[in-house]
Design a protein with these regions (language model features):
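A short, well-ordered alpha-helix in the C-terminal region of glycosyltransferases
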Residues: 321, 328, 335-349, 358-361
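Aromatic "clamp/platform" in nucleotide-sugar-dependent glycosyltransferases that forms part
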Residues: 275
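Short hydrophobic beta-strand element within catalytic cores of glycosyltransferases
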Residues: 283, 292-295, 305
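Conserved donor-binding/catalytic core segment of Leloir-type glycosyltransferases
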Residues: 147, 185-212, 225
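Membrane-proximal helix-turn-helix segments that form the acceptor-binding/catalytic region
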Residues: 125-147
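Carbohydrate-associated surface elements
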Residues: 152, 173
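Conserved acidic donor-binding segment of nucleotide-sugar-dependent glycosyltransferases
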Residues: 307-308, 312-319, 328-333
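Nucleotide-activated donor-binding/catalytic signature segment of Leloir-type glycosyltransferases, i.e.
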Residues: 237-255
Length: 371
């Protein structure tokens, strides 16, 4: 088959995130299964307009703020006559509304909807644009099949009016050869908490920093390692300074996967206080490294955590509960190890091979369906 994927970024983009990892891990495997995959994505300074990355043909057009406006024009001018069997549209950030511009079969791939959370992340005008664009999804994509990464995302689409028959849940995977416990579990530190992810408002990393003040009143040696980049870093560093936490909180910036695994293997706990996620991929990565997680009880994170079995869920915005659970688990090693064992066992279920196989099954089903 020839498959066209439309996504905002490719894996080499400086701002590549979870959606790009999902695409790359899934579709490089689909290429190895004998299929041709073309990615249409946005440009960035220094990027070539065309190149091959791990067997995927990458075509770049438009820029960060213009890509969704460029896609329909570029598709009709350069790609409409190509013999693609299906288009996979990644509904990440702003939909491209490709069903309005082509009659080819479309698989809509959805990680999560921003909903009202987008108003915390950007200015009111752009937030309104994103919010209204998401409200149009049920009408524009009413004849499309959807692949979503969590049950929460599926349920949200159903509440918006789509049929459950249109939606397939396929969880993200992890590289189980890389994400695994250290050979010497006793080498784990006793009070190292780690956060990994983008430094964006909706991630609520400030809640975790404020919780650390309370944690250190009980556990003075507790430290926080923040892995990731984003536009909130300067504000978060200023918050650490105002809370006298500059010595206790370390910002790593971007790190390689290997370095991230090394930190997770040493960490006592991981914490994710987000407003919302598509799927808690970082939860599963931490679990695979034998690191229990405390996270907010919100879509995506509640799908990745079995509360009280593989991790702990707390109410959104409850910094006291966050601090309380971090303190409790730091002090209760048997409970921490119970959660770690359960989480590590469950993490083995989530592999990119399985994600790719199930995605390919959905694509083949759509392509083989009668017109």
């Amino acid at each position: 088959m020839r498959i066209l994927v439309v996504n905002w970024r490719d894996i080499h983009h400086p701002e590549a995130g979870g959606a790009e990892v999902h695409f790359h891990e899934t579709f490089t495997r689909i290429v190895k299964a004998g299929h041709h995959v073309t990615l249409l994505c946005s440009r960035y300074p220094g990027a070539e307009t065309r190149e091959w990355i791990d067997g995927i043909e990458v075509i770049r057009t438009g820029w960060k703020l213009t890509f969704n406006l460029t896609v329909p024009w570029f598709y009709h001018r350069h790609l409409a006559r190509e013999a693609f069997d299906i288009i996979v549209e990644d509904l990440n950030k702003i939909p491209f509304f490709l069903p309005c511009f082509t009659k080819r079969p479309i698989l809509a791939l959805l990680h999560h909807l921003f909903g009202t959370a987008v108003f915390r992340e950007t200015n009111p005008i752009f937030a309104s644009y994103v919010y209204l664009a998401e409200r149009l999804i049920p009408a524009v994509y009413r004849r499309c099949f959807f692949e979503v990464v969590s049950e929460s995302s599926r349920d949200e689409l159903i509440r918006m009016g789509l049929s459950s028959d249109q939606i397939t849940v396929i969880h993200n995977g992890i590289d189980t050869r890389l994400y695994k416990p250290t050979d010497v579990l006793d080498q784990k530190e006793t009070a190292l908490i780690v956060y990994m992810g983008r430094l964006k408002r909706y991630k609520n990393v400030d809640h975790l920093i404020l919780a650390m003040t309370a944690v250190r009143e009980v556990v003075p040696e507790a430290r926080l390692c923040i892995i990731g980049t984003g536009d909130q870093r300067e504000a978060l560093e200023a918050l650490c300074q105002s809370q006298n936490l500059t010595e206790a909180v370390h910002f790593t910036g971007f790190v390689s996967d290997l370095a991230k695994v090394g930190i997770l293997q040493q960490a006592t706990l991981a914490a994710f206080p987000s407003d919302k996620e598509g799927w808690g991929l970082t939860v599963i990565e931490a679990n695979a490294c034998y690191t229990p997680v405390v996270a907010t009880d919100v879509p995506g994170l509640r799908d990745a955590i079995i509360d009280g079995e593989t991790g702990i869920l707390i109410p959104l915005g409850d910094q006291k509960a966050l601090a309380r659970e971090l303190i409790r688990l730091i002090q209760d090693r048997p409970e921490r190890e119970r959660l770690a064992r359960n989480g590590a066992k469950r993490a083995t279920q989530f592999t990119w091979d399985t994600t790719a196989e199930k995605t390919l099954e959905v694509i083949e089903k759509i392509v083989m369906a009668p017109p």
